[in-house]
Protein backbone atom coordinates (compact mmCIF):
# COMPACT_ATOMS: atom_id res chain seq x y z
CA UNK A 1 0.00 0.00 0.00
CA UNK A 2 1.22 3.50 -0.80
CA UNK A 3 2.47 5.27 2.29
CA UNK A 4 3.30 8.92 2.72
CA UNK A 5 7.06 9.23 3.09
CA UNK A 6 8.21 11.20 6.13
CA UNK A 7 11.46 13.06 5.51
CA UNK A 8 13.93 14.18 8.15
CA UNK A 9 14.23 17.77 6.94
CA UNK A 10 11.73 19.81 4.88
CA UNK A 11 14.41 20.46 2.24
CA UNK A 12 14.20 16.78 1.24
CA UNK A 13 10.66 17.52 0.04
CA UNK A 14 11.48 20.88 -1.56
CA UNK A 15 10.35 23.01 1.40
CA UNK A 16 12.49 25.57 3.21
CA UNK A 17 12.98 25.05 6.95
CA UNK A 18 13.20 28.83 7.25
CA UNK A 19 9.76 29.13 5.69
CA UNK A 20 8.32 26.78 8.31
CA UNK A 21 10.04 28.77 11.07
CA UNK A 22 8.59 31.98 9.59
CA UNK A 23 5.13 30.45 9.77
CA UNK A 24 5.56 29.28 13.37
CA UNK A 25 6.62 32.79 14.41
CA UNK A 26 3.77 34.45 12.47
CA UNK A 27 1.18 32.08 13.97
CA UNK A 28 2.44 32.78 17.46
CA UNK A 29 2.42 36.55 16.89
CA UNK A 30 -1.15 36.37 15.58
CA UNK A 31 -2.30 34.23 18.52
CA UNK A 32 -3.89 31.58 16.30
CA UNK A 33 -4.55 28.25 18.01
CA UNK A 34 -3.85 25.55 15.45
CA UNK A 35 -3.73 22.05 16.91
CA UNK A 36 -1.91 20.00 14.28
CA UNK A 37 -0.59 20.82 10.79
CA UNK A 38 0.97 18.63 8.11
CA UNK A 39 2.91 20.20 5.24
CA UNK A 40 3.45 17.90 2.24
CA UNK A 41 5.18 18.29 -1.10
CA UNK A 42 5.97 15.80 -3.88
CA UNK A 43 4.12 13.14 -1.88
CA UNK A 44 6.40 13.55 1.13
CA UNK A 45 5.57 14.83 4.61
CA UNK A 46 7.92 17.79 4.94
CA UNK A 47 6.88 18.96 8.41
CA UNK A 48 4.46 18.04 11.18
CA UNK A 49 3.48 20.76 13.64
CA UNK A 50 1.83 19.32 16.76
CA UNK A 51 0.93 21.80 19.47
CA UNK A 52 0.71 19.93 22.78
CA UNK A 53 -1.60 18.83 24.30
CA UNK A 54 -2.99 18.29 20.79
CA UNK A 55 -1.55 15.83 18.29
CA UNK A 56 -1.94 14.63 14.71
CA UNK A 57 -3.42 11.19 15.47
CA UNK A 58 -6.45 12.01 17.65
CA UNK A 59 -9.66 12.24 15.56
CA UNK A 60 -10.82 15.86 15.59
CA UNK A 61 -14.19 17.49 14.95
CA UNK A 62 -14.11 18.67 11.31
CA UNK A 63 -17.29 20.73 11.02
CA UNK A 64 -17.82 21.52 7.31
CA UNK A 65 -14.63 19.81 6.15
CA UNK A 66 -16.94 16.79 6.45
CA UNK A 67 -18.66 18.05 3.29
CA UNK A 68 -15.69 17.17 1.08
CA UNK A 69 -15.90 13.53 2.21
CA UNK A 70 -19.67 13.41 1.66
CA UNK A 71 -19.00 14.77 -1.82
CA UNK A 72 -16.57 11.89 -2.43
CA UNK A 73 -19.35 9.45 -1.54
CA UNK A 74 -21.53 11.11 -4.18
CA UNK A 75 -18.70 10.65 -6.67
CA UNK A 76 -18.57 6.92 -5.99
CA UNK A 77 -22.36 6.59 -6.28
CA UNK A 78 -22.30 8.25 -9.70
CA UNK A 79 -19.34 6.15 -10.82
CA UNK A 80 -21.23 3.00 -9.85
CA UNK A 81 -24.31 4.07 -11.82
CA UNK A 82 -26.61 4.39 -8.82
CA UNK A 83 -27.18 8.10 -9.43
CA UNK A 84 -26.21 10.73 -11.98
CA UNK A 85 -25.26 14.35 -11.42
CA UNK A 86 -28.68 15.19 -12.86
CA UNK A 87 -30.63 12.90 -10.51
CA UNK A 88 -33.47 14.93 -9.01
CA UNK A 89 -33.75 15.02 -5.25
CA UNK A 90 -37.50 14.46 -5.13
CA UNK A 91 -37.18 11.46 -7.46
CA UNK A 92 -34.61 9.83 -5.19
CA UNK A 93 -36.37 10.86 -1.96
CA UNK A 94 -40.09 10.84 -2.88
CA UNK A 95 -41.04 10.08 0.71
CA UNK A 96 -39.55 13.44 1.74
CA UNK A 97 -41.06 15.49 -1.09
CA UNK A 98 -44.11 17.75 -0.66
CA UNK A 99 -47.34 16.52 -2.22
CA UNK A 100 -47.21 19.30 -4.79
CA UNK A 101 -43.58 20.38 -5.19
CA UNK A 102 -42.92 23.63 -6.99
CA UNK A 103 -41.29 23.71 -10.41
CA UNK A 104 -38.04 24.93 -8.89
CA UNK A 105 -37.98 22.29 -6.15
CA UNK A 106 -38.79 19.60 -8.70
CA UNK A 107 -35.71 20.53 -10.70
CA UNK A 108 -33.13 20.44 -7.84
CA UNK A 109 -30.47 17.86 -8.69
CA UNK A 110 -27.51 16.21 -7.02
CA UNK A 111 -25.29 18.65 -8.94
CA UNK A 112 -27.17 21.63 -7.49
CA UNK A 113 -26.83 20.34 -3.94
CA UNK A 114 -23.11 19.66 -4.32
CA UNK A 115 -22.28 23.11 -5.70
CA UNK A 116 -24.52 24.97 -3.21
CA UNK A 117 -26.78 26.09 -6.03
CA UNK A 118 -29.99 24.34 -4.97
CA UNK A 119 -31.93 27.56 -4.43
CA UNK A 120 -33.40 26.15 -1.20
CA UNK A 121 -34.60 28.88 1.13
CA UNK A 122 -32.35 30.02 3.95
CA UNK A 123 -34.66 28.59 6.62
CA UNK A 124 -34.04 25.09 5.28
CA UNK A 125 -30.57 25.29 6.83
CA UNK A 126 -31.84 25.74 10.40
CA UNK A 127 -33.14 22.22 10.95
CA UNK A 128 -31.10 20.64 13.73
CA UNK A 129 -33.69 19.06 16.06
CA UNK A 130 -36.63 16.68 15.88
CA UNK A 131 -36.99 14.17 13.08
CA UNK A 132 -37.83 14.11 9.36
CA UNK A 133 -35.04 16.52 8.48
CA UNK A 134 -35.20 15.82 4.75
CA UNK A 135 -38.96 16.28 4.55
CA UNK A 136 -38.84 19.49 6.57
CA UNK A 137 -35.99 20.89 4.46
CA UNK A 138 -37.78 20.22 1.18
CA UNK A 139 -40.98 21.70 2.62
CA UNK A 140 -39.15 25.05 2.76
CA UNK A 141 -39.12 25.14 -1.06
CA UNK A 142 -36.78 27.32 -3.16
CA UNK A 143 -36.47 31.06 -3.48
CA UNK A 144 -34.18 30.91 -6.54
CA UNK A 145 -34.14 28.78 -9.65
CA UNK A 146 -31.63 25.94 -9.09
CA UNK A 147 -28.21 26.71 -10.51
CA UNK A 148 -28.64 30.48 -10.56
CA UNK A 149 -27.54 31.52 -7.06
CA UNK A 150 -24.85 30.32 -4.67
CA UNK A 151 -26.09 29.85 -1.12
CA UNK A 152 -24.02 27.90 1.39
CA UNK A 153 -26.44 25.38 2.88
CA UNK A 154 -25.29 22.54 5.12
CA UNK A 155 -28.72 20.92 5.04
CA UNK A 156 -28.26 20.61 1.28
CA UNK A 157 -25.25 18.40 1.98
CA UNK A 158 -27.37 16.44 4.44
CA UNK A 159 -29.76 15.79 1.55
CA UNK A 160 -26.79 14.43 -0.44
CA UNK A 161 -26.13 12.06 2.46
CA UNK A 162 -29.79 11.02 2.37
CA UNK A 163 -29.58 10.33 -1.37
CA UNK A 164 -26.44 8.23 -0.98
CA UNK A 165 -27.99 6.22 1.84
CA UNK A 166 -31.22 5.72 -0.11
CA UNK A 167 -29.55 4.17 -3.17
CA UNK A 168 -26.82 2.22 -1.36
CA UNK A 169 -28.66 1.06 1.75
CA UNK A 170 -25.68 2.26 3.80
CA UNK A 171 -24.73 5.42 5.62
CA UNK A 172 -22.14 7.57 3.88
CA UNK A 173 -19.57 6.50 6.46
CA UNK A 174 -20.17 2.78 5.94
CA UNK A 175 -20.26 3.22 2.17
CA UNK A 176 -16.86 4.96 2.25
CA UNK A 177 -15.14 2.32 4.39
CA UNK A 178 -14.12 -0.07 1.56
CA UNK A 179 -13.93 2.65 -1.11
CA UNK A 180 -11.93 5.38 0.64
CA UNK A 181 -11.06 4.82 4.28
CA UNK A 182 -9.47 1.38 3.90
CA UNK A 183 -7.59 1.95 0.60
CA UNK A 184 -6.07 5.20 1.89
CA UNK A 185 -5.21 3.80 5.33
CA UNK A 186 -7.63 6.14 7.07
CA UNK A 187 -9.14 3.66 9.50
CA UNK A 188 -8.58 4.47 13.16
CA UNK A 189 -6.31 2.58 15.51
CA UNK A 190 -7.50 -0.99 15.88
CA UNK A 191 -9.28 -0.88 12.52
CA UNK A 192 -12.27 1.16 13.67
CA UNK A 193 -14.07 3.29 11.11
CA UNK A 194 -14.09 7.07 11.58
CA UNK A 195 -16.89 8.49 13.69
CA UNK A 196 -19.59 10.44 11.84
CA UNK A 197 -22.56 11.85 13.74
CA UNK A 198 -26.07 10.93 12.60
CA UNK A 199 -29.36 12.79 12.60
CA UNK A 200 -32.27 11.41 14.65
CA UNK A 201 -33.34 9.76 11.37
CA UNK A 202 -30.18 7.61 11.31
CA UNK A 203 -28.50 9.48 8.44
CA UNK A 204 -24.92 10.77 8.65
CA UNK A 205 -25.00 14.56 8.90
CA UNK A 206 -23.07 14.81 5.64
CA UNK A 207 -22.23 18.49 5.94
CA UNK A 208 -20.72 18.16 9.40
CA UNK A 209 -20.16 15.62 12.18
CA UNK A 210 -17.11 13.72 10.87
CA UNK A 211 -14.07 13.19 13.11
CA UNK A 212 -10.67 12.64 11.52
CA UNK A 213 -7.11 13.29 12.64
CA UNK A 214 -4.62 15.33 10.66
CA UNK A 215 -2.88 12.03 9.96
CA UNK A 216 -6.09 10.68 8.39
CA UNK A 217 -6.87 13.82 6.38
CA UNK A 218 -3.40 13.89 4.80
CA UNK A 219 -3.76 10.88 2.46
CA UNK A 220 -7.12 12.21 1.26
CA UNK A 221 -5.45 15.48 0.28
CA UNK A 222 -2.57 13.69 -1.40
CA UNK A 223 -4.97 11.43 -3.31
CA UNK A 224 -6.82 14.51 -4.55
CA UNK A 225 -3.53 15.99 -5.72
CA UNK A 226 -2.77 12.73 -7.55
CA UNK A 227 -6.14 12.98 -9.36
CA UNK A 228 -7.49 10.04 -7.37
CA UNK A 229 -4.56 7.69 -7.93
CA UNK A 230 -3.24 5.74 -4.95
CA UNK A 231 -0.88 2.78 -4.93
CA UNK A 232 -1.13 2.58 -8.72
CA UNK A 233 -4.94 2.39 -8.71
CA UNK A 234 -7.69 4.91 -9.40
CA UNK A 235 -9.23 5.10 -5.92
CA UNK A 236 -11.17 8.36 -6.10
CA UNK A 237 -13.26 8.76 -9.27
CA UNK A 238 -11.42 11.00 -11.75
CA UNK A 239 -14.60 12.57 -13.12
CA UNK A 240 -15.69 13.50 -9.61
CA UNK A 241 -12.31 15.09 -8.84
CA UNK A 242 -12.44 17.14 -12.04
CA UNK A 243 -15.87 18.45 -11.09
CA UNK A 244 -15.33 18.78 -7.35
CA UNK A 245 -12.09 20.74 -7.54
CA UNK A 246 -13.04 23.24 -10.24
CA UNK A 247 -15.58 26.05 -10.02
CA UNK A 248 -19.11 24.84 -10.74
CA UNK A 249 -20.83 28.05 -9.66
CA UNK A 250 -19.94 31.72 -9.14
CA UNK A 251 -19.98 32.44 -5.41
CA UNK A 252 -19.13 36.15 -5.58
CA UNK A 253 -21.75 38.27 -3.86
CA UNK A 254 -20.20 41.72 -3.90
CA UNK A 255 -19.52 41.70 -0.16
CA UNK A 256 -15.83 40.90 -0.54
CA UNK A 257 -13.02 42.01 -2.88
CA UNK A 258 -12.90 40.10 -6.15
CA UNK A 259 -9.81 38.17 -5.03
CA UNK A 260 -11.27 37.18 -1.64
CA UNK A 261 -11.07 33.50 -0.68
CA UNK A 262 -14.86 33.20 -0.61
CA UNK A 263 -15.31 34.77 -4.06
CA UNK A 264 -13.13 32.49 -6.18
CA UNK A 265 -15.78 29.94 -7.13
CA UNK A 266 -17.17 26.78 -5.55
CA UNK A 267 -16.90 23.20 -6.77
CA UNK A 268 -18.53 20.12 -5.30
CA UNK A 269 -18.08 20.90 -1.59
CA UNK A 270 -14.67 22.47 -2.22
CA UNK A 271 -13.73 26.16 -2.27
CA UNK A 272 -11.49 27.60 -4.94
CA UNK A 273 -8.66 29.54 -3.27
CA UNK A 274 -6.82 32.76 -3.79
CA UNK A 275 -3.62 32.02 -5.65
CA UNK A 276 -0.47 33.67 -6.92
CA UNK A 277 -0.65 31.54 -10.07
CA UNK A 278 -1.19 33.05 -13.48
CA UNK A 279 -4.76 32.89 -14.86
CA UNK A 280 -5.47 29.54 -16.45
CA UNK A 281 -2.77 27.73 -14.50
CA UNK A 282 -3.38 24.80 -12.20
CA UNK A 283 -5.62 25.69 -9.27
CA UNK A 284 -5.43 25.86 -5.52
CA UNK A 285 -8.52 24.61 -3.74
CA UNK A 286 -9.59 23.57 -0.27
CA UNK A 287 -12.09 21.78 1.87
CA UNK A 288 -12.65 23.72 5.06
CA UNK A 289 -14.62 23.73 8.27
CA UNK A 290 -15.44 26.19 11.02
CA UNK A 291 -12.59 27.17 13.31
CA UNK A 292 -10.07 26.45 10.54
CA UNK A 293 -10.16 22.75 9.73
CA UNK A 294 -8.45 22.51 6.32
CA UNK A 295 -7.20 20.38 3.51
CA UNK A 296 -5.58 22.69 0.94
CA UNK A 297 -4.27 21.42 -2.40
CA UNK A 298 -1.91 23.51 -4.56
CA UNK A 299 -1.40 21.69 -7.86
CA UNK A 300 1.22 24.10 -9.21
CA UNK A 301 3.50 23.52 -6.24
CA UNK A 302 2.57 19.82 -5.97
CA UNK A 303 1.72 20.58 -2.37
CA UNK A 304 -0.87 19.74 0.31
CA UNK A 305 -1.40 21.35 3.70
CA UNK A 306 -3.90 19.95 6.17
CA UNK A 307 -4.69 21.04 9.69
CA UNK A 308 -7.10 20.80 12.61
CA UNK A 309 -7.53 23.91 14.69
CA UNK A 310 -9.46 26.16 17.00
CA UNK A 311 -9.08 29.40 15.00
CA UNK A 312 -12.29 31.43 14.47
CA UNK A 313 -10.74 33.74 11.86
CA UNK A 314 -10.45 31.39 8.87
CA UNK A 315 -9.31 34.19 6.58
CA UNK A 316 -6.36 35.07 8.80
CA UNK A 317 -5.45 31.39 9.17
CA UNK A 318 -5.46 30.92 5.39
CA UNK A 319 -3.53 34.13 4.80
CA UNK A 320 -0.64 33.08 7.04
CA UNK A 321 -0.49 29.68 5.38
CA UNK A 322 -0.34 31.22 1.92
CA UNK A 323 2.24 33.79 3.03
CA UNK A 324 4.57 31.35 4.76
CA UNK A 325 3.84 27.63 4.29
CA UNK A 326 3.14 27.67 0.55
CA UNK A 327 5.78 30.33 0.01
CA UNK A 328 8.28 27.99 1.69
CA UNK A 329 8.18 25.94 -1.52
CA UNK A 330 9.57 28.94 -3.41
CA UNK A 331 12.43 29.69 -1.01
CA UNK A 332 16.00 28.40 -1.31
CA UNK A 333 16.97 25.49 0.94
CA UNK A 334 18.01 26.49 4.44
CA UNK A 335 21.42 25.56 5.76
CA UNK A 336 21.99 22.87 8.39
CA UNK A 337 21.96 25.32 11.29
CA UNK A 338 18.47 26.56 10.39
CA UNK A 339 17.30 22.98 9.90
CA UNK A 340 18.53 22.16 13.39
CA UNK A 341 16.69 25.16 14.84
CA UNK A 342 13.46 23.99 13.21
CA UNK A 343 13.83 20.42 14.45
CA UNK A 344 14.28 21.68 18.00
CA UNK A 345 11.37 24.08 17.65
CA UNK A 346 9.05 21.31 16.47
CA UNK A 347 9.66 19.42 19.72
CA UNK A 348 8.72 22.46 21.79
CA UNK A 349 5.39 23.45 20.22
CA UNK A 350 2.75 23.64 22.94
CA UNK A 351 0.09 25.79 24.56
CA UNK A 352 0.59 26.80 28.21
CA UNK A 353 -1.37 25.64 31.22
CA UNK A 354 -2.05 27.82 34.28
CA UNK A 355 0.80 28.02 36.75
CA UNK A 356 0.19 27.74 40.49
CA UNK A 357 2.06 29.87 43.01
CA UNK A 358 1.36 27.45 45.85
CA UNK A 359 -1.07 29.68 47.71
CA UNK A 360 -4.24 28.27 49.25
CA UNK A 361 -7.39 28.07 47.17
CA UNK A 362 -10.27 30.28 48.42
CA UNK A 363 -12.35 27.40 49.77
CA UNK A 364 -16.11 27.85 49.57
CA UNK A 365 -19.34 27.47 47.64
CA UNK A 366 -20.19 30.25 45.19
CA UNK A 367 -23.48 30.80 43.38
CA UNK A 368 -24.79 33.06 40.65
CA UNK A 369 -28.54 32.81 40.97
CA UNK A 370 -29.33 34.68 37.76
CA UNK A 371 -27.10 32.26 35.83
CA UNK A 372 -28.11 29.16 37.83
CA UNK A 373 -24.42 28.36 38.27
CA UNK A 374 -22.67 27.01 41.35
CA UNK A 375 -18.89 26.74 41.78
CA UNK A 376 -17.31 24.68 44.54
CA UNK A 377 -13.74 25.11 45.74
CA UNK A 378 -12.08 22.86 48.28
CA UNK A 379 -8.47 22.73 49.37
CA UNK A 380 -7.23 20.94 46.24
CA UNK A 381 -9.93 21.12 43.56
CA UNK A 382 -12.36 23.45 41.80
CA UNK A 383 -15.67 22.25 40.37
CA UNK A 384 -17.48 24.31 37.72
CA UNK A 385 -20.43 23.22 35.53
CA UNK A 386 -19.99 23.22 31.75
CA UNK A 387 -22.72 23.95 29.15
CA UNK A 388 -23.34 20.20 28.68
CA UNK A 389 -24.27 19.91 32.36
CA UNK A 390 -21.15 18.04 33.43
CA UNK A 391 -19.05 19.33 36.31
CA UNK A 392 -15.48 20.00 35.21
CA UNK A 393 -12.85 19.47 37.89
CA UNK A 394 -9.69 21.57 38.03
CA UNK A 395 -6.62 20.70 40.11
CA UNK A 396 -4.03 23.39 40.95
CA UNK A 397 -0.74 22.94 39.14
CA UNK A 398 -1.72 19.55 37.74
CA UNK A 399 -3.05 18.72 34.26
CA UNK A 400 -5.73 16.04 34.64
CA UNK A 401 -7.42 14.14 31.83
CA UNK A 402 -10.92 12.73 32.16
CA UNK A 403 -12.40 11.27 28.99
CA UNK A 404 -12.04 13.84 26.24
CA UNK A 405 -11.16 16.78 28.46
CA UNK A 406 -7.93 18.03 29.99
CA UNK A 407 -7.99 20.61 32.76
CA UNK A 408 -5.78 22.52 35.15
CA UNK A 409 -5.98 25.56 37.41
CA UNK A 410 -3.61 27.82 39.28
CA UNK A 411 -3.52 30.70 41.75
CA UNK A 412 -1.42 33.74 40.90
CA UNK A 413 -1.45 36.91 43.03
CA UNK A 414 -4.81 36.09 44.58
CA UNK A 415 -6.55 35.37 41.26
CA UNK A 416 -7.61 31.92 40.08
CA UNK A 417 -7.17 30.74 36.49
CA UNK A 418 -9.07 27.70 35.14
CA UNK A 419 -8.34 26.16 31.73
CA UNK A 420 -10.05 23.25 30.00
CA UNK A 421 -9.05 21.80 26.62
CA UNK A 422 -10.66 19.10 24.49
CA UNK A 423 -8.09 17.24 22.34
CA UNK A 424 -10.70 16.09 19.80
CA UNK A 425 -12.53 19.41 19.52
CA UNK A 426 -11.60 23.02 18.75
CA UNK A 427 -12.99 24.38 22.01
CA UNK A 428 -11.06 25.82 24.95
CA UNK A 429 -12.77 27.06 28.11
CA UNK A 430 -10.73 29.75 29.86
CA UNK A 431 -11.95 31.21 33.17
CA UNK A 432 -10.30 34.07 35.06
CA UNK A 433 -11.61 34.53 38.62
CA UNK A 434 -11.02 37.45 40.96
CA UNK A 435 -12.17 37.61 44.59
CA UNK A 436 -13.24 40.78 46.42
CA UNK A 437 -12.83 41.76 50.07
CA UNK A 438 -16.13 40.09 50.99
CA UNK A 439 -14.96 36.83 49.42
CA UNK A 440 -17.36 36.98 46.47
CA UNK A 441 -16.08 36.02 43.01
CA UNK A 442 -16.19 37.56 39.55
CA UNK A 443 -15.69 35.13 36.67
CA UNK A 444 -14.74 36.06 33.11
CA UNK A 445 -15.47 33.07 30.87
CA UNK A 446 -14.02 32.74 27.38
CA UNK A 447 -14.72 29.91 24.97
CA UNK A 448 -18.40 29.48 25.85
CA UNK A 449 -20.18 31.44 23.16
CA UNK A 450 -18.66 33.95 20.72
CA UNK A 451 -17.78 36.60 23.33
CA UNK A 452 -16.40 36.52 26.89
CA UNK A 453 -19.02 36.55 29.64
CA UNK A 454 -18.77 38.07 33.10
CA UNK A 455 -20.53 36.30 35.98
CA UNK A 456 -20.71 37.59 39.55
CA UNK A 457 -20.93 34.86 42.19
CA UNK A 458 -21.75 35.21 45.88
CA UNK A 459 -19.99 33.07 48.46
CA UNK A 460 -22.64 31.22 50.47
CA UNK A 461 -20.53 28.74 52.42
Where are these regions (language model features)?
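Short active-site loop at a secondary-structure junction
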Residues: 28-38, 51-95, 102-108, 144-152
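Active-site SXXK
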Residues: 43, 61-86, 113, 160-164, ...
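Structured C-terminal helix/loop/strand segments within mature extracytoplasmic catalytic/sensor domains
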Residues: 287-353
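Peripheral terminal and inter-domain segments
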Residues: 334-461
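A short, well-structured edge-of-sheet supersecondary motif
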Residues: 19-54, 302-306
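Active-site Gly/Thr loop motif
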Residues: 188, 193, 245-304
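Active-site helix/loop module of the DD-peptidase/beta-lactamase fold
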Residues: 61, 80-118, 139, 167-207
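Active-site-proximal alpha-helical segments within enzyme catalytic domains
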Residues: 156-163, 208-229, 241, 293-310
Amino acid sequence: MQQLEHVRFPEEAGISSQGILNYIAAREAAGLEHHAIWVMRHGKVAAKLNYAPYDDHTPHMLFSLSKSFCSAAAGFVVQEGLLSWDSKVIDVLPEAAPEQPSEWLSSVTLHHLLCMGSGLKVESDGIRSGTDWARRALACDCDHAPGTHFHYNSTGTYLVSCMVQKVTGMTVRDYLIPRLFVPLGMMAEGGAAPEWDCSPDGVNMGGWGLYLSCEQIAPFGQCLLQKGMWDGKQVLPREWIDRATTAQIDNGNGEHPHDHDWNMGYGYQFWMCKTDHEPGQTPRYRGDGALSQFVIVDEKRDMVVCCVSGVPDIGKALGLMYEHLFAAADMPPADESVQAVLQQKLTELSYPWPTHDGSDLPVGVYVAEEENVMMTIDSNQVGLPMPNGEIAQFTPGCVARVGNTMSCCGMQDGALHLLLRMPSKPFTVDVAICFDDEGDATLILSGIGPDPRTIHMKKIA
